[in-house]
Amino acid sequence: MSALSLVILGLLMAVPPASCQQGLGNLQPWMQGLIAVAVFLVLVAIAFAINHFWCQEEREPMNMVMTTGNKADGILIGTEGKYSSMAASFRSNEHENAYENTSEEEGRVHSTPM
């Protein structure tokens, strides 16, 4: 086995080394730039795809619409049958689906909840 490897090594040493610089010729500068931009865009697309699938947040439950009499209220899944009295305190008198933007004063900062 060692004699065979010595023969192969000798043949490889006798063959002249290949020169990588003697190709068909260098590409034009505009072609190099075009290839560089295309490779960059492919890498960015791969990064966006990985980010989209890897960093996906869990989706929130969709709203259900429950009709009570003449009015439809949006209810989150799992809160059926529970009434929130928070909305009653700032519901508008002008329209049933509008809310008042009540102001709260915190020290010198004037803020509104919406």
UniProtKB/Swiss-Prot annotation:
Location(s) in or outside the cell: Apical cell membrane
InterPro entries hit by this protein: PDZK1IP1/SMIM24 (IPR031627)
Side of membrane Extracellular, spans: 1-28
Any Pfam family: MAP17
Function recorded in the entry: Auxiliary protein of electrogenic Na(+)-coupled sugar symporter SLC5A2/SGLT2 and SLC5A1/SGLT1. Essential for the transporter activity of SLC5A2/SGLT2 but not SLC5A1/SGLT1.
Similarity-based family: Belongs to the PDZK1-interacting protein 1/SMIM24 family.
Subunit field text: Forms a heterodimer (via N-terminal transmembrane helix) with SLC5A2/SGLT2 (via TM13); this interaction enhances SLC5A2 transporter activity. Interacts with PDZK1.
Protein name: PDZK1-interacting protein 1
